[in-house]
Amino acid sequence: MKPYQRQFIEFALNKQVLKFGEFTLKSGRKSPYFFNAGLFNTGRDLALLGRFYAEALVDSGIEFDLLFGPAYKGIPIATTTAVALAEHHDKDLPYCFNRKEAKDHGEGGCLVGSALQGRVMLVDDVITAGTAIRESMEIIQAHGATLAGVLISLDRQERGRGEISAIQEVERDYGCKVISIITLKDLIAYLEEKPDMAEHLAAVRAYREEFGV
């Protein structure tokens, strides 16, 4: 685990974005941890979040021309990541996002920001069922652009309804790499360093045994 990944876990714990305990997911599964990126909700939170996303992008080595944030949660992520890349990595890249409903007046269309072209890096909070990615792919392809990759905050590394995860489905269906700031494996490595969190470590390991990919 790299220093920025450990710092991100601590940031998420601090903001109660990441919690350990017993939680029922939308799928009905009982999970020993819960991640709610919506709780990164202040100016400072967003500034820090952008730095973590930018760090993960630079670390990945994936080449891309533009950041795309799917409405709605991807919008502030794309914005703050673009700022962080420019301020901390000297990479001044364009970004854009979609509207849920296309405007029929003013500038019109369903996109806001830069022209959607070239190699697109899609940024979002998490991938649950992959629906937002599929909707975004239709927009990206309609504009003649290509998907360079997807970056999310957390990869739960667990099976969907079948034998593979929603993330593996996206990689298979679109031939692109999905990267994340942290993974379930990183969470376990972090818990292993914390003797006072041993009960959570046992629960997360058991969960990975049952649902992991």
UniProtKB/Swiss-Prot annotation:
Its cofactor is Mg(2+). Orotate binds at F34, F35, T128, R156. Keywords: Glycosyltransferase, Magnesium, Pyrimidine biosynthesis, Transferase. It is an enzyme of class 2 (transferase). InterPro entries: OPRT (IPR023031), Or_phspho_trans_dom (IPR004467), PRibTrfase_dom (IPR000836), PRTase-like (IPR029057). It comes from the Bacteria. Gene3D superfamilies: 3.40.50.2020. It catalyses: orotidine 5'-phosphate + diphosphate = orotate + 5-phospho-alpha-D-ribose 1-diphosphate. 5-phospho-alpha-D-ribose 1-diphosphate binds at residues 26, 72-73, 99-100, 103, 105, 124-132. GO terms for molecular function: magnesium ion binding; orotate phosphoribosyltransferase activity. Its EC number is 2.4.2.10. It holds the Pfam family Pribosyltran. The keyword Nucleotide-binding does not apply. PROSITE patterns: PUR_PYR_PR_TRANSFER (PS00103). GO terms for biological process: 'de novo' pyrimidine nucleobase biosynthetic process; 'de novo' UMP biosynthetic process; pyrimidine ribonucleoside biosynthetic process. Pathway: Pyrimidine metabolism; UMP biosynthesis via de novo pathway; UMP from orotate: step 1/2. GO terms for cellular component: cytoplasm. Catalyzes the transfer of a ribosyl phosphate group from 5-phosphoribose 1-diphosphate to orotate, leading to the formation of orotidine monophosphate (OMP). Belongs to the purine/pyrimidine phosphoribosyltransferase family. PyrE subfamily. HAMAP family: PyrE. Homodimer. This is Orotate phosphoribosyltransferase. It comes from Salmonella agona (strain SL483). The lineage of its organism: Bacteria, Pseudomonadati, Pseudomonadota, Gammaproteobacteria, Enterobacterales. The gene is pyrE.
